[in-house]
Structure formats: structure tokens, C-alpha cells
Amino acid sequence: MMKTHFDLLKDRWNLSASARVPRHDLVFGTPVNAPAAGLPIGDGDTGSLLWLEKDGLRIHINKCDLWQDAPPGVTWDDECYCSGHEEELTCVKHAGEISIRFDAPVFEYLYQKRFTARLSLADASASVNAETPFGDLSVRAFAEHDSGVTVLSLRSRSEDAASPAVTLSRWGSRTLWRWYSQQKFTPEEGLNGTAACAEDGRLFVTQQLNGTSFCVGLSMRGEEDRSASVLNRHAASYRLAEGETHGFTLYWTVKTGGDVREAAENCAAALRDAERTGEDALYARHAAAWREFWDKSYVTLADDYLENIYYLYLYVMNSESRGAYPPHFTSGLWGFYHDYVPWVYYFHYNIQHMYAPLDAAGHGELARNYYDLRRNGMPQFRKYAEKVKKKPGLFVHDVTDRYGRGADYDSLNCTPAAQIALEMFRHYRYTGDEEFLRDYALPMMRGAAEFYLGMLEVGEDGLYHIRGTTAYEGNAPTDDTLTDYVMIRALFPALAAYCEGEERERLDDAVSRLPGPMLMELEESDWDGRLFTFGIGKGREPLGDGRVFGIGYRDGEPVRKSYGDPDCPKRGYGFPDIELSPLYPAGIFGLKDRGTPLFDTMTNQLMLHGTGSHCGHWNMLPVYLARMGRGDLFAENCRGMLESNQGFLNGFNAESGEGGCPGGWPQWYEYTETESREKYGVATGDFTHFDFETGPILAMGIIESLLQSHEGVIRVFPAVKEGEDAAFLLYAQGGFLVGGERTGEGCVVTVTSLRGGGCTVCLPESSGWRGYRRIRGTCAELDVPAGGNCETEVRFDCLGAGETVLLTTVPLGELETVGVEASAPNPGWKRCGGVSLGSPGLPGTR
């Protein structure tokens, strides 16, 4: 008998992510008095990072659309950044801060008798409970989406009478986007345009930016006596009457307006509505919305830590990606150092990862702001192509601002437009949204193709060539750059399916006359003549003829990336994973090519991929492993990636650094003042910041280890390690909901057509698969062919909308249905080698 969560009578899975995610709560058993250990809560548009200080709480508030535009005439019309104009740029500013102060060290580690801080994923709430020799304190906070209001309730008891203070403030600053190299020494930057006031018992701070007027408002409700006063133009405060017990509820929100007066009115109206609704009703609505969010999909892995990272990724995206603009790829809505935003622009290679997993997880709506950003930028993309590249079509610079304007440097990477176009097309393939195809995907696809057609030149060999481009971020240019060719091979056929006549002929002709892949021999730094000496394949034998891919030609000579010898000047190329671009982002190579010589070549290439410190936080190794079916290497390398890059206890990653300094930089770093060029030292620890790339990449890899549909087939469990249990409810391109469960007793898979149509399903290797067509409780057995060497392939030509196909290795009579299993809340911290989620408990409480 096999126990399965698929209900044969009701044709549904008894799998509930809302019931499972409590096991993945983020739990601190000891207080960590640092913003980098903060708890993020957000309504999708406004985010609040809550962290502990020895005598209270601090909350840093961000909103996705608080734009400070560059002063008119400073930057060029079609460029986002003009060299030499530091701090005169278009960037997002923070909203403000709230501090709650007590007259005692309530969160000092030395005085804790009992302590728990918890980020509850199921209901997206943060809570803190502390018991000390001089009193007790409890806090709960959540951010409700519909109202745009965040709510915090606090109860405290102290041995001595105390008079807590709650302060709302905003202290603007420089953006310091190039913190790692240079700064403009203007300490007064960002302080103008701020005003604080107290009206009708509420606190407000307004801010006039160049381009945005906004207000952050705070109200306190409770029966205690309190006073409200303005401290200065940047801050206003509540002071509670002295007493041994205190209890109050805070409501805060951030609103924009045509001017600061309108913004303040919008703020006050939202606070009044929230106060009338009340905390309990707001929480009930909030918890129900999150329950619905979680139950759109489901994942269970054998590795609990990786599963936790997956659900943390979804939590963060729903908390910060429902506003008008996509969050930044570093700190997103969780920055905590005034207006500091490292790498302030939208860097294409970095931000694309955040959205790649969402459609398969059933949450493609969270990528809409990203697609809007790119669609709205098309006029600027066309201008940049004409002005800088002297070509028709759309050119997306790797670095753009909110208008789509590209930087005035490093304009040789031609791939972003094609990548974005294919991301949009993939979204359409999941949703079937014809309006989106018409207004978003096809215009971007046509513009990207038009640009590439203008770049292609016919060589003496009769083939098309591209000259002088770079792969990904700027490096020394090459000819016939691999990343360009793979994006053309992915984009042109996808677009050609929607074209006719001459337009289609041009696309087909270009693809048919592209050079083949450049293959190169292994060198001494790669292997010892028998085994690899570097990378994840160290100690393994190369496959086939032992060749790998080149990345292009420089001065007529083929170029490879350096692996075992990273200082080798002949082959060095600074940005990783170029040779693996056929796997991702192009998606033109994968398990469909198994058994071919090129599959051996790609395997060799993958085996040379670095690990740990040789592997950046933005590399796509988990996705490559999944797309090559390497379940045997998947989990261990994902964990290795976390050990190298998860820099913070709340799951955010750092830039491959250790200690308190970002990116592994030294404690002090020499900077250049941008105008005087004077050198001076800065404590780099001040510039610690989150990065949000490793989590999304791991989430995409996890999904693709369970389900793939980018090759035109639905491939189930393609990279799950033999003997490991797993289960999922995920979505496939073409409009299918796919469920799968694998245990030691067998495997059950369902494919439900959401809008009608055919599909091909590739199942894990087995000769014992059975198939059943299920329509409204009826069941008809299907013929399933015997499996091949690697997998069993089943074709269903016509499935009606809502129709389900059941595939199982166990006879129906030997399946025993089990119900939804509710997980208990996570009791404590979790560890993955040298990194952890949360912090350990106190003695006697673990």
C-alpha cells in the first residue's frame, strides 16, 4: 500500500501550504540587537523592518514608489546615469522610522529569562515576547494589504513605573549607491523638505521630493493617557503616562499625493478607516488573504532547510512585490540605513531572478509591476537603440532607471531585451492572457528581434555573425558572443510562430544561418589528464571527447572562461555562467538533448562550475543542476550556496562575505570623494545591506527539480535524488496544474488542464506506470507505454478544461488517501552548516 495525499474520490490533493508553512517560521530564541536580524512585514507596497535594540524596538519603513527624480537638466534625456553626477539621480527614498523606547534594557540578552521573536509565515505576522527580572513585554505586528495600514499591538508590565516613548521620524540622507568606491561628501543631502506635525492625536511626517510628495502617519489607540508633541521638523512623539502596565495599538501608513497636504489628508483618512475597522477585523481579513495566497501551490522536500528558504522567498515576494514598482534586488523594502540604496538602479541580470519562479508557483501576479516597468520603458529602449547603438528596435541596457533610461557606460551587452521579451512570453504561456501577449510580450519580442536583426552581419562563410559585444555585464568584447546566439535561437522561433510572410522568413533565415556552438578542449587548469581538478565535478571523469564551450572570439582567437586558474590572462572573463546560458536563461538546451554529444559537453561544462567562494550569490547553479537532471548533486550544492551566501539570520543573503562587513570587504575601506578626488577611510560595516538573489535562484532551482515545462513537455521529478521523498502542486506552461508525490512506496502524478489542450508528460524512469482519465468522478484506464532508459513519455492530445489525468506506479486499489497534515509551529532555530535561520534558545527553554 502507498499512502498518498491525492483524494481519489474528490479528485483533489490534500496538500495545503498554509498548513505546512508554520514549520518554517523564523524563530529567534535570543534577542539579536541589530537591523540585519530584523523581521520583515509588508503589504506588498509598503514594508516595515522590525528589529530589537537594548531598550526597545525600531521599525524602518519603506514604500516602493517614493521617487526622488534627478534634477531637470542634470542627466541626459535618454540616460539614467551620467558619469560625474553623484547623488543627482532618480532613486527611491525611505519613508521614515518608528522607535519605541522603554526606561530599561528590555531586550538586552543579559536580562532575558524567556524570549522568543517569531516571523509567522502562515499569517505574515511578527511577534516578540520577553520576560526579564524587571518586567514582561509582548508585541504583535502585521501589514494589511487592502487598507495599506500596518498594525502593532504592545502590552508591557514593569516592576517600576515607566513612561515609554513612541517616536515617528524621518532623517533623509545621501543614497550612497556606489558605497564600495566613492561618495559625494555632502552630509546635508536629503535633509530638506521634511516637516513633522501632530494633529487630532496623530503624528505625521511629510516629505517633498523632486517628483513625489508623501506622508507617513502614525496613530496610537488605547485607554492610557498620553501626550503628542513635535520634537523638531523631522520627528514627532507620543509619551505615555508613567505606570507599571501599558497597552496600546499603533497604526501606521504611507501615502502619496499631488502635494504634501494631499498626501497628509490621504494618510489621515487611511488611519481613520483602520481605527474604525479595528485590529481584530483587520487581522482576520489579513490572515484570510494570506491563507488564500499560500494554498495556490505546495512544495515538500526531503531537505527541510531548503524547503524553508523556498517558502521564505514566497513570503518576501508577496510582502514587497504588489506595488506599482518592483522592489530593488538588494534591500527591497527592507533597507534600514536612512536613504542608502546600494546599486540604486534596476540591474537586469540581478533583478530577473526575483520573478523567474513565480508563474510555476501560481503567483505570476507578483511580477506584474516588473512587466509594467519594462513595457513602460519601451520608448526609452527604442531611443537608446537609435542614439547609442545606431540600430532599429529595442535595446535594454543592463542598468536602467524607472523610466527605462540606460546608463552612459558599458552598452555592449545586447541580451537583456531578448531575455525580458522571453520572460514576458513565458508568463503568457502560463496564463494564456491574450491581452498580455498583445500589449506586452509581442511588442518586446518584436523590438528585441528587430535590434538583433540589425546587428547580424553576413560573413565570408555565408553565416550571420555579431561583432564586438559582451556577455552579461561589461567585460572585454568578443565576436560571435555565445549569449547573443543562444538568445537569438530562443527568441526568433518563439516570435516566428506569430509572424507571417517576409517577417517570418527573416527570422527563420537568421536562425538557419547562425554559427554552431564553439567547442574547445580542456586545459591543464581544468583536469589532470584523467579527472577534473576543479568545480563541482572535481574527481570525476569528463564525458565524451572531453570538450567544453567557448564564449566567443577575441582578435580571431577563441576565448574560454578560466576555471581552475582564475588569473589566467588568456581565458579570463569576469562574469560567470556564460557557457551555461543555453540552459538558462535561453532554455534551448536541456534534458531533451540527453544522449547527444552536446549533452556530454554541457555536462563537462557544468562539472567545472565553481562552488562556495568560487561561486557568486547571483549564479544559477541550482537551475543548471535541475535542468541537467542532476538530482545527485542538487541538494548538496544548494546547501553549499547557502553556506557561502546566506549572510543574515533572517534568511537574506550577503555578497559572499563574512562577518559584519558587506561583501567580505575589510573593516575600513578607502573611498574617493567624487569632486575633490580626495581619498578617505570609511567603516564598511556601516554599509551592511541585504541582498535578495540567492533565495529566488534557489526557489527556481527547487521548482525545476520537481517540475519543468520550458521544453514543450511537462517533466515530473526531473532532478529529485533517488530515494528522497518529495511532493508538489505547481503550474506548467500551457495552462496545467500538476501535482506529484513520491515516496519509497511509489509515485502519484496528476495533470489537470486549466483551459483545455494537449500535453506530453515525461515521468521518472519506471516500467510500471498506469494512467487514468478522470472526469467528474469517473475513471477510465489509459495505455501508458513502457519507459525508456531515462523516462516514460505519455502524450495526451486533447484534455478538456478541468479534466484530470492520474498517473501512478501503484494500482488504484493499493492507494490509501490521507488527509491534510497540519505542521506544528517551528520550535526554534535551524542550521545549515555554518549559517542559520533564527537564533538559539536560552538555557532551559530550548
What are these regions (language model features)?
Residues 88-111, 116, 688-739, 747:
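Catalytic cores of secreted or luminal carbohydrate-active enzymes
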Residues 162-171, 752-767:
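Surface-exposed beta-strand/loop patches in extracellular or lumenal glycoproteins
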Residues 145-154, 734-760:
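Carbohydrate-binding surface patches
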Residues 347-383, 400-404, 409-434, 439-442, ...:
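Active-site core of glycosidic bond-cleaving carbohydrate-active enzymes
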Residues 447, 451-498:
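Acidic/histidine-rich catalytic neighborhood
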Residues 132-140, 144-149, 421, 426-443, ...:
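A conserved hydrophobic secondary-structure block that centers on an alpha-helix together
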Residues 2-36, 41-344, 363-364, 374-383, ...:
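Acidic/polar, glycine-enriched structural segments that form the non-catalytic walls/loops
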Residues 178-180, 762-779:
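Solvent-exposed beta-hairpin/edge-strand motifs
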